[in-house]
Amino acid sequence: MKIGIIGGGSVGLLCAYYLSLYHDVTVVTRRQEQAAAIQSEGIRLYKGGEEFRADCSADTSINSDFDLLVVTVKQHQLQSVFSSLERIGKTNILFLQNGMGHIHDLKDWHVGHSIYVGIVEHGAVRKSDTAVDHTGLGAIKWSAFDDAEPDRLNILFQHNHSDFPIYYETDWYRLLTGKLIVNACINPLTALLQVKNGELLTTPAYLAFMKLVFQEACRILKLENEEKAWERVQAVCGQTKENRSSMLVDVIGGRQTEADAIIGYLLKEASLQGLDAVHLEFLYGSIKALERNTNKVF
């Protein structure tokens, strides 16, 4: 099967490596230099102290000559991708973004494509234009959005590497909100406080603030089992206690964060429902202020 991976970041390179073991994969990049490097060198993956390599094609333009397109760019980069996707023929498109900001866009995006959404539970760090470090084994989980047919992707994903499992979930909202609640509790606080994930559990004041954020987000998302969700947030914090969240890494690196995708979605939903979200509003404003002052690390 022919699969196009849109985005040459950590998730894009990770997906491209593993999917290329079973499919004809092309990475669609923004920069010609990266496309040329992937075309000539392939993709290198580092895992458990070993290096692996896979051949892969690359290009800088999107076309409809694919059985599946996997969109891995960050949410704030999606608008240019949407406009490109509107110009190609009908195909299957899987969106793998942090947060849920793109959901509002997808609901208003009236195209003939079959749309799917998913989450990435792997840890990955891009080392170069052609290399990715697989830092944590997890899974890709996906679901059909609106009236898309799940069988189309189930056929595509029937063969996968054991270190890169791909699972179908029946309820896209439950799938995405399950990860969103974790990201909303951990990412903004660690970025604001400049701490590793584990400190949110070991510092009482941080834990108390995280619980307030959790309760506010739960009310907005109307989560069914808050106790189980809170246990999940704490478990992820503990399992990744030595990690710096992606939002903290972006703040330190002077890059735009995914605050709009994570907190922005919750604030928009709160507004639509007429709910107060004072803690999330504070976090959102604080992170956006940090983005404007990227030369300052507190």
From Swiss-Prot:
Query: Could you say which residues bind substrate here?
Result: 98, 183, 187, 197, 246
**Can you tell me which residues bind NADP(+)?**
7-12, 98, 124, 258
Under which EC number(s) is this enzyme classified?
1.1.1.169
Q: Which reaction does it catalyse?
A: (R)-pantoate + NADP(+) = 2-dehydropantoate + NADPH + H(+)
Indicate the enzyme's highest-level EC class: oxidoreductase
Q: Does this entry carry the keyword Cytoplasm?
A: yes
What are the protein's GO molecular function terms? Answer: 2-dehydropantoate 2-reductase activity; NADP binding
Its pathway, per UniProt, is:
Cofactor biosynthesis; (R)-pantothenate biosynthesis; (R)-pantoate from 3-methyl-2-oxobutanoate: step 2/2
A Gene Ontology biological process term: pantothenate biosynthetic process
Q: Where in the cell is it found?
A: Cytoplasm
Mind telling me which Pfam families this protein's record contains? Answer: ApbA (PF02558), ApbA_C (PF08546)
Per the annotation, which location comes first and is thus the protein's main one? Answer: cytoplasm
Q: Describe the function of this protein.
A: Catalyzes the NADPH-dependent reduction of ketopantoate into pantoic acid.
The entry's family comment says: Belongs to the ketopantoate reductase family.
* Protein name per the record: 2-dehydropantoate 2-reductase
Per the UniProt record, the source organism is Bacillus subtilis (strain 168)
